[in-house]
Design a protein with these regions (language model features):
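Ligand-binding loop in jelly-roll beta-barrel domains
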Residues: 224, 246-247
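Acyl-donor-binding surface of acyltransferase catalytic domains
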Residues: 43, 54-156
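Short secondary-structure junctions
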Residues: 3-6, 35, 44, 125-130, ...
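Secondary-structure transition/turn motif
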Residues: 73-78, 174-175, 221, 227
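Conserved acetyl-CoA-binding loop-helix of GNAT-fold acetyltransferases
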Residues: 81-95, 229-246
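Conserved beta-hairpin
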Residues: 35-64, 73-74, 191-208
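Short amphipathic alpha-helix that is part of the acyltransferase structural core
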Residues: 1-29, 142-182
Length: 247
């Protein structure tokens, strides 16, 4: 069985096929943001397997700033098929991956085992892996609509603000391991995606904030130490969820 590359002109038409949650959430979400123009600077390629009735999908997000992302999802429970899918799809963009210093794969552990096997088989230069187990959470449309109707209250003396590229430096100061290229990455995300902050009115300082990662997931939440235990983090996260859903 062969893999195939989705032509860019077909990205819009393939979206309904990918709207299977949570199985294809990362692939669908990334492509949807790209099609709508609500994503940081990048190029995206999408692959499927097999050609007849595809059940295995990969989105390769080549970021202008920062490492590329490989997002993998499947609607099949047949783990015996995973290896065939990986070994059919990855050669279609393996040369691009080889040219990168690093890349991030988002997928199930059962699939990642075959990704690791492929990379070893194809002799990737200086290849090593670092697994970071995560749990993914999402809300269905009914719960999103409910959230839109939920009032979000801040303590006295605080107010919501929208963040943009001009706030990148403040956000970067909370990232102790940031590299020199991360500033451009953060600015690109703030320019294209919703981002929320809470400001302390008296001092004008940003007290808490959250913005989206390169795939549109909310994952960068921070409250400055002097403003913690006031409920600002929960308020920021709810407001960002509202903004993401509206956009």
């Amino acid at each position: 069985m062969a893999a195939f590359r989705v032509a860019p002109k077909d990205y819009c038409s393939v979206l309904p096929t990918l709207k299977v949650f949570p199985d294809l959430l990362s692939v669908y979400g990334t492509l949807k943001l790209f099609v709508d123009g609500n994503i940081d600077d990048c190029k995206i390629e999408v692959f499927g397997f097999p050609e007849e009735k595809p059940v295995f999908w990969v989105a390769y997000k080549e970021n202008t700033f920062g490492k590329p992302f490989v997002l993998i999802g499947t609607t099949s429970d047949e783990e015996s098929m995973y290896k065939n899918a990986i070994f059919a799809i990855f050669p279609l963009f393996a040369e691009s991956l080889k040219s990168k210093e690093s890349f991030e794969v988002v997928t199930l552990k059962a699939i990642m085992d075959h990704v690791r096997s492929f990379l070893q088989t194809f002799d990737f230069p200086l290849f090593t892996t670092l697994d970071e187990p995560n749990s993914m959470f999402y809300m269905n449309e009914q719960n999103c609509e409910k959230l839109l109707q939920t009032p979000i209250n801040l303590p006295d003396g605080f107010e919501f603000i929208s963040l943009d590229e001009n706030d990148a430096q403040v956000l970067m100061e909370t990232m102790p391991y940031a590299s020199h290229t991360d500033m451009s990455m953060v600015k690109s995300r703030l320019a294209a995606m919703p981002a929320v902050g809470v400001r302390h009115v008296e001092t004008g300082k940003i007290a808490a904030f959250e913005y989206n990662d390169g795939c549109g997931f909310i994952s960068h939440l921070y409250t400055f130490p002097e403003y913690r235990r006031l409920g600002l983090g929960a308020a920021v996260e709810k407001r960002l969820c509202q903004m993401n859903y509206k956009k």
